[in-house]
Amino acid sequence: MSRRGTTEEKTAKSDPIYRNRLVNMLVNRILKHGKKSLAYQIIYRAVKKIQQKTETNPLSVLRQAIRGVTPDIAVKARRVGGSTHQVPIEIGSTQGKALAIRWLLWASRKRPGRNMAFKLSSELVDAAKGSGDAIRKKEETHRMAEANRAFAHFR
């Protein structure tokens, strides 16, 4: 048995303006080369663009987008008897949110457009409406898990 003590799970801090943990998770995920102030600028500009596009509370659009992209189940490669199987596993809420944020940023980087704030705001609005590449990625993951349901006993 390990002698190392159990670590406490870190709670995400909230950002200075909106006091929202999801915004802070998004900032930390978009961060490159330690330039956090630039990451905050991108997120806040995207939030302003969402406000202009939808004329509703941008944080509710963000919550709705993340809720729509969050997967319930994913597949994990597991090697059994010389062959690798894609085994479906259930995902917890924290890991699901992290995956959703990662997929939203991946989809917004892939979009053609002017700047990251514009692309991110467009992707968030689309995800809140139930369309966009991030939603497609979630559906693809769920389809993979459904197709490999026979391997669920390898968990």
Swiss-Prot record:
GO process terms (BP): translation
Subcellular location: Plastid, Chloroplast
Swiss-Prot/TrEMBL keywords: Chloroplast, Plastid, Ribonucleoprotein, Ribosomal protein, RNA-binding, rRNA-binding
GO MF annotation: an example: rRNA binding
Pfam families registered for this protein in UniProt: Ribosomal_S7
Gene3D superfamilies: Ribosomal protein S7 domain
InterPro entries: Ribosomal_uS7, Ribosomal_uS7_bac/org-type, Ribosomal_uS7_CS, Ribosomal_uS7_dom, Ribosomal_uS7_dom_sf
Entry GO CC: chloroplast; small ribosomal subunit
Cross-referenced NCBIfam families: rpsG_bact
Reported function: One of the primary rRNA binding proteins, it binds directly to 16S rRNA where it nucleates assembly of the head domain of the 30S subunit.
Subunit structure: Part of the 30S ribosomal subunit.
Recorded family membership: Belongs to the universal ribosomal protein uS7 family.
Protein name, per record: Small ribosomal subunit protein uS7c
Organism: Saururus cernuus (Lizard's tail)
Gene: rps7
